[in-house]
């Protein structure tokens, strides 16, 4: 479809995913919930049993566990808890990664299309704001180096994992600039203005993900009206 309309696109690659070793923890959580009618989990000092016997109950369980995992203080905490859930309910995270993510050969095929730009997306899809400055910088640099080695071309663009205010802020914007990325995108909703030229590693995006969206709403989203209200009519949200 994009080729038909001569529309360029950028694909941001987390290098562990292309190597088949990534942790798609949110997808693993879906797989855990899909294969059981109830989930036993220890959250803090409380042992919980969550109903997962109906589609609605599964969605509620996913929302509860997803929010808990995202709120854990460190990446190692999240990894520990999702690994325990996967072990208890027989989900192989690496097999999920290999089946769902592009391999390096597939990334190379995609990158050969002149409409396609490949950007970096860290090594492990880590929440950079929860990492030390050293680790966050390394996640950016190593991801970029691995992609450049695989594709034999420079990688100039970056996308922050998760990309919201809890995952990317002023420190991360500065790290991306220091790493030499020409642009870096968040998931903060917003349109592009001339003022964004001074904040090229803190760019907003308009999310067309199908959630609460249909063809009638698309003109509103692309007009900038919705994101203007979201941002309190500020053109730049780079702090």
Name each model-derived stretch.
Residues 22-113:
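Extended, charge-rich helix/loop segments that form flexible
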Residues 19, 91-92, 97, 106-108, ...:
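Homeobox/homeodomain signature
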Residues 3-12, 67-94, 117-122, 126, ...:
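CE4/NodB-like, metal-dependent polysaccharide N-deacetylase domain
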Residues 1-30:
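Long, hydrophobic, well-ordered secondary-structure blocks that form the structural core
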Residues 21-41, 48, 112-113, 126, ...:
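C-terminal active-site subregion of NodB/CE4 polysaccharide deacetylases
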Residues 14-16, 123, 189:
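Histidine-centered beta-alpha loop that forms part of the nucleotide-sugar donor binding/catalytic region
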């Amino acid at each position: 479809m994009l080729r038909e309309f001569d529309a360029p696109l950028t694909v941001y690659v987390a290098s562990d995913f292309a190597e088949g070793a990534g942790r798609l923890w949110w997808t693993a959580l879906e797989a855990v919930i899909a294969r059981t009618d109830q989930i036993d989990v220890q959250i803090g000092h409380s042992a919980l049993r969550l109903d997962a016997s109906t589609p609605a109950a599964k969605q509620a369980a996913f929302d509860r566990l997803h929010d808990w995992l995202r709120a854990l203080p460190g990446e190692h905490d999240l990894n520990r808890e999702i690994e325990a859930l996967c072990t208890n309910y027989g989900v192989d995270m690496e097999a999920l990664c290999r089946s769902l993510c592009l391999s390096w050969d597939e990334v190379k095929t995609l990158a050969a299309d002149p409409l396609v730009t490949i950007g970096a997306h860290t090594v492990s899809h880590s929440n950079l704001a929860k990492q030390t400055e050293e680790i966050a910088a390394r996640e950016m640099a190593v991801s970029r180096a691995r992609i450049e080695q695989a594709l034999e071309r420079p990688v100039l663009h970056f996308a922050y994992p998760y990309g919201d205010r809890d995952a990317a802020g002023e420190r991360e914007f500065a790290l991306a600039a220091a790493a030499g990325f020409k642009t870096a995108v968040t998931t903060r909703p917003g349109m592009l203005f001339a003022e964004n030229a001074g904040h090229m590693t803190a760019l907003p995006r308009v999310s067309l993900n199908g959630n609460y969206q249909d063809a009638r709403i698309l003109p509103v989203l692309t007009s900038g009206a919705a994101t203007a209200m979201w941002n309190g009519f500020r053109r730049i949200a780079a702090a």
